[in-house]
Swiss-Prot record:
Transmembrane segments: none annotated. Keywords: Pyrimidine biosynthesis, Transferase. It comes from Christiangramia forsetii (strain DSM 17595 / CGMCC 1.15422 / KT0803) (Gramella forsetii). GO terms for molecular function: amino acid binding; aspartate carbamoyltransferase activity. SUPFAM superfamilies: Aspartate/ornithine carbamoyltransferase. NCBIfam families: asp_carb_tr, PRK00856.1. L-aspartate binds at K88, R171, R225. Catalyzes the condensation of carbamoyl phosphate and aspartate to form carbamoyl aspartate and inorganic phosphate, the committed step in the de novo pyrimidine nucleotide biosynthesis pathway. It holds the Pfam family OTCace_N. This is Aspartate carbamoyltransferase catalytic subunit. It comes from the Bacteria. Carbamoyl phosphate binds at R60, T61, R110, H138, Q141, G266, P267.
Length: 310
């Protein structure tokens, strides 16, 4: 296995090789041990400065990246579009170049426009990590999801994973499909027909419209929220109707003929895509995902920073 990534940026899962994912996971294993020690910090990136640029609201992802960076002893700059010159009409390139002029080595960016990270990587001299670009990709979320499956079930290869909910507007769904397929998992999607992208089968995934049938088939169910903030029209009759057809509750979970692993990338809309008694049950690894997110992001940052230092 190579000791370095094949890419200089993490722009999306589709740019990675299986060997890259394996290297990230092996590195994350090491950092998982580190963050469970009494002293959780390592001096690996004392000479690296990282800017977190968030042009969309975020809680878990932003905090997870910031904690990962500080655990690695990097210098961290946090940028919020809401309180910046972006509000005055400043372009993305001008914003980033102003920040890079302060000798920043790496940029972690969330942006509402698909492909923003790709665009940026072609115009600036810094390593770029995509922390979510519109409804396009969210690579570190997919990596931590696969890492959590690997930790729980031993391997991702050969596992059956169903992604349930708003697939159409979800960057998490797309990145997960790419990551899971790359590692040899079988993938199906389940949700209202109006929330499934056209030609989704072209990505090598199956489509199942019945939630119980999908759950009977899978080893892992990744429950996604309905992204109302990305909708300008109604995609289903009512929330009540959605819950009836695609909400996961304890009664449905208990009716299955086997045990499955429940995941959710957050934020959870309790009582909609998943009930509290399922989200808080022993079947769910939702908080494991959050903890693993720090270790996986430490691994990604460390491996990309290693290429900067060369």
């Amino acid at each position: 296995m190579s000791s370095e990534l094949s890419v200089d940026h993490l722009l999306g899962i589709k740019y990675l090789k299986p060997e890259d994912i394996e290297l990230i996971f092996k590195t994350a294993d090491h950092f998982k041990e580190v963050i469970n020690r009494p002293i959780k910090k390592v001096p690996s990136l004392r000479d690296i400065t990282i800017a977190n640029l968030f042009f969309e609201n975020s809680t878990r992802t932003r905090l997870s990246f910031e904690l990962a960076e500080k655990r690695l002893s990097a210098d961290v700059i946090n940028f919020s579009a809401a309180s910046s010159s972006v509000k005055k009409g400043e372009t993305l390139i001008d914003t980033v170049n102003n920040i890079l002029s302060m000798k920043v080595d790496m940029v972690v960016m969330r942006h509402p426009n698909p492909g923003a990270g790709i665009f940026l990587s072609k115009h600036v001299d810094a390593s770029i990590i995509n922390a979510g670009d519109g409804a396009h990709e969210h690579p570190t979320q997919a990596l931590l999801d696969s890492y959590s499956i690997r930790e729980k079930l031993g391997d991702v290869r050969g596992k059956k994973v169903v992604i349930v909910g708003d697939i159409l507007h979800s960057r998490v769904a797309l990145s997960n499909i790419f990551a899971l397929k790359l590692q040899g998992a079988e993938v199906k999607v389940c949700g209202p027909k109006t929330l499934l992208p056209k030609h989704i089968e072209s990505l090598g995934v199956g489509v199942e419209m019945n939630l119980k049938t999908a759950l009977e088939w899978c080893d892992v169910a990744n429950m996604l929220r309905v992204q109302n903030e990305r909708m300008d029209i109604s995609y289903f009759p009512s929330t009540r109707e959605y819950v009836k057809q695609f909400g996961l509750n304890k009664k449905l979970l208990d009716s299955l003929k086997k045990e499955i692993v429940i995941m959710h990338p957050g934020p959870i809309n309790r009582g909609v895509e998943i009930t509290s008694d399922v989200a808080d049950s022993e079947h769910a690894i939702i908080l494991d995902q959050v903890q693993n997110g720090v270790a996986v992001r430490m691994a990604v940052i460390y491996l990309l920073a290693s290429k900067i230092k060369q």
